[in-house]
Structures are given as structure tokens and as C-alpha cells.
């Protein structure tokens, strides 16, 4: 499974990429919407895991675009915990809306990674 991770916080980006790689996923990282759009134009992905508070815009715009143009599974990973924000995320096309700090088990389930794939 090839996953595009869009996250502006370096440590979070690195941890997500490392844990997903240990589960057998191929990960590509982007630190903002501009980088993510470039990656989406260059290669195909099975899923998008994106923060919503990005330095160059709202990650929900990226989610909506990726769903429309590429049909990707989209998972929000965000600090936006309010119910209204969750509703906005689901309307924009998020298949799953996970809040930070991320429960990696929930992320694996959202991506459909079988439990026997270990991140340890």
C-alpha cells in the first residue's frame, strides 16, 4: 500500500512514516499542500493521511481534491477535536477523522492494515 502523508510537524511526519513503513506500507511524505499536490501529480497512491492545519492552507481542500481527482482513501489526522470540525471533515471526503495524539491502532484499522502486521 502506498500512502501519502501530509504533515507539517517534522516529528509527527517521521513517526507516522516510520510506523507505517514497519507495517509494510510504502510511504511518501509532504510537509504542505504544495508538496502534496506535486507528489499526487507524480505517482499514484492508495491512501492520503493528512493533517488539516497546514502552513499553506486547509488540509480539507487537499482531501476534497484528492478524492475528486484520484479516488484515494482519505484519513484526517488533526488537532481539531470539535464535532463541527469532524462533520466538515467527513463532508469534505475524509473516510476517517482521527484526532491527535493519534492512536496508531486506529490509524492501521482505518487504512485496512491487518493486525498481524506489526509496527514494533
What are these regions (language model features)?
Residues 10-28:
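Two-component/phosphorelay signaling modules centered on CheY-like receiver
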Amino acid at each position: 500500500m502506498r500512502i501519502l502523508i501530509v504533515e507539517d510537524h517534522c516529528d509527527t511526519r517521521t513517526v507516522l512514516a516510520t510506523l507505517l513503513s514497519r507495517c509494510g506500507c510504502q510511504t511518501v511524505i509532504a510537509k504542505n499542500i504544495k508538496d502534496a499536490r506535486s507528489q499526487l501529480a507524480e505517482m499514484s497512491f492508495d491512501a492520503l493521511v493528512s493533517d488539516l492545519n497546514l502552513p499553506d492552507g486547509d488540509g480539507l481542500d487537499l482531501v476534497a481534491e484528492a478524492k475528486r481527482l484520484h479516488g484515494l482513501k482519505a484519513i484526517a489526522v488533526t488537532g481539531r477535536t470539535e464535532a463541527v470540525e469532524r462533520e466538515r471533515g467527513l463532508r469534505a471526503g475524509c473516510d476517517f477523522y482521527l484526532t491527535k495524539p493519534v492512536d496508531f491502532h486506529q490509524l492501521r484499522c482505518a487504512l485496512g492494515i491487518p493486525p498481524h502486521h506489526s509496527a514494533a
